[in-house]
UniProtKB/Swiss-Prot annotation:
Gene this chain is encoded by: rpsC
One GO cellular component term: cytosolic small ribosomal subunit
Biological process (GO), any one: translation
Protein name: Small ribosomal subunit protein uS3
Oligomeric form and interacting partners: Part of the 30S ribosomal subunit. Forms a tight complex with proteins S10 and S14.
Gene Ontology MF, one: mRNA binding
KH type-2 domain sequence ranges: 39-111
Function: Binds the lower part of the 30S subunit head. Binds mRNA in the 70S ribosome, positioning it for translation.
Family: Belongs to the universal ribosomal protein uS3 family.
Comp. bias intervals (Polar residues): 241-252
Region (Disordered): 222-252
């Protein structure tokens, strides 16, 4: 069922780790899950145009229960930090008001945003909302990701494509995206685009390479990371149709 499940969740505990790191009693788990959800929602709403790819939350020490450490991974750190750190300080104040706890906010820059699934999907959604043709949007996103060092890319857009009366799904794929291989580092994201014809669903899969014994997920995400010699090369790019790189299915 690798084709049906979320690739991020399927690989948790195998090659991926959790974005929330904390250990508490069973009674406290629901409250902290809700608190983490509200923290991420506040940060994303506060800095909508900062291209945030991931938000990590840590509560590691039992002695410091009232201390939360947050790591925000973004392609535009200057938007969150602001002039002399003013914007960051405002965000910290809002987080303290929300959680009633001490907050340590760290902003980390994402070096290569062209092969991060969430940022690619958000960029595609923005282009679709600006009425760019959906096939061109997919092809441009795939080309950028491959140039950035991705081993394989797959995209899928669903909805009233081009303003059609009947909703359908259409996608493109290039390179290898082995969803059934658990050691394969696959980044996945799903985003919605709100257009004049309705909501379009966008899904993006990025294959960074295989995490071999002795490696971590960071080794596969380096720019132009080397791949093992026994891994097949990706197939040539071809955007002129064909079953290998084109998916077209009616929505049930």
């Amino acid at each position: 069922m690798g084709q049906k499940t979320n690739p991020n969740g399927l690989r948790l505990g195998i090659i991926r780790t959790w974005e929330s790191q904390w250990y508490v009693n069973d009674k406290e788990i629901p409250n902290l899950i809700k608190e983490d959800f509200l923290i991420r929602k506040l940060i994303n709403n506060f800095a909508k145009k900062s291209a945030i790819s991931q938000i990590d939350i840590e509560r590691l020490k039992e002695k410091n229960k009232n201390r939360i450490t947050i790591f925000v991974h973004t392609a535009k750190p200057g938007v969150i930090i602001g002039k002399d750190g003013d914007t960051r300080n405002k965000l910290v104040v809002k987080l303290k008001e929300l959680t009633q706890k001490e907050v340590n906010l760290n902003v980390l820059e994402v070096k290569n945003s062209d092969k991060i699934a969430l940022l690619i999907a958000q960029n595609m959604a923005e282009q679709l909302e600006n009425r760019m043709f959906f096939r061109r949007v997919q092809k441009m996103a795939i080309q950028k990701a491959l140039k950035a060092g991705a081993k394989g890319v797959k995209t899928l857009i669903s909805g009233r494509l081009g303003g059609a009366e009947i909703a359908r799904s259409e996608g493109h794929a290039e390179g290898r995206v082995p969803l059934h291989t658990l050691r394969a580092d696959i980044d996945y994201a799903a985003v919605e685009a709100h257009t004049t014809y309705g909501v379009l669903g966008i899904k993006v899969w990025i294959f960074h390479g295989e995490v071999l014994p002795g490696q971590t997920i960071l080794d596969t995400r380096k720019p132009f990371a080397s791949q093992s010699s026994n891994t097949p090369n990706r197939r040539p790019r071809n955007f002129k149709g064909g079953n290998n790189n084109h998916v077209n299915a009616k929505k049930n």
